[in-house]
């Protein structure tokens, strides 16, 4: 997966709490088992006015021209609650998002996001509100997420620190998912396998 060190990008806010995985990617779009192709269905019931997804909702932030190309999502508490579907971080990443900033995340979503190279950043509610207000007030405003130094920088230059388990931080910095982490020990695995007697293989 793509490594995450420091990312600066356009931020977009969905000022709602308890955004669940069925809102992130509705169940009717879960038939695929590969990670690509889900971005078009992200927030389907909010982004579109029709079931077919042909009529964009002009009032939804992700459809507004000023937020086109946004790579950082701001949201309220308990983001990613609901079912454990891994398609939720797949859809967010396939849409082009690199980081989600919210006061709290559902535990399973939080882990799934990290495992798929999507950085979930927990900040105090007041910090998230300041970021939302600055982004709303300044078209084209960019936010920086610095994983190396564990800080977020607002459009005005305000800095907010966040925490992340060191193992997760290192995996994201190096772009290692579960498979990549295993392959990093390929030499040791091969050496161990070479010592297994033939009759036990």
UniProtKB/Swiss-Prot annotation:
User: Where exactly are the transmembrane stretches of this chain?
Assistant: none
Q: What EC number(s) is this enzyme filed under?
A: 4.2.1.33
- Where are the coiled-coil regions? none
Looking at its record, which EC class is this enzyme?
A: lyase
GO cellular component annotations, sorted alphabetically?
3-isopropylmalate dehydratase complex
Per the record, the pathway is: Amino-acid biosynthesis; L-leucine biosynthesis; L-leucine from 3-methyl-2-oxobutanoate: step 2/4
Keyword Membrane present in the record's keywords: the answer is no
Keyword Heme in annotation: no
**What Gene Ontology molecular function terms does this protein carry?**
3-isopropylmalate dehydratase activity
* Main function: Catalyzes the isomerization between 2-isopropylmalate and 3-isopropylmalate, via the formation of 2-isopropylmaleate.
Entry's family note: Belongs to the LeuD family. LeuD type 1 subfamily.
**Oligomeric form and interacting partners:** Heterodimer of LeuC and LeuD.
Query: Per its record, how is this protein called by name?
Result: 3-isopropylmalate dehydratase small subunit
Organism from which the protein derives: Shewanella amazonensis (strain ATCC BAA-1098 / SB2B)
Which gene does this sequence derive from?
leuD
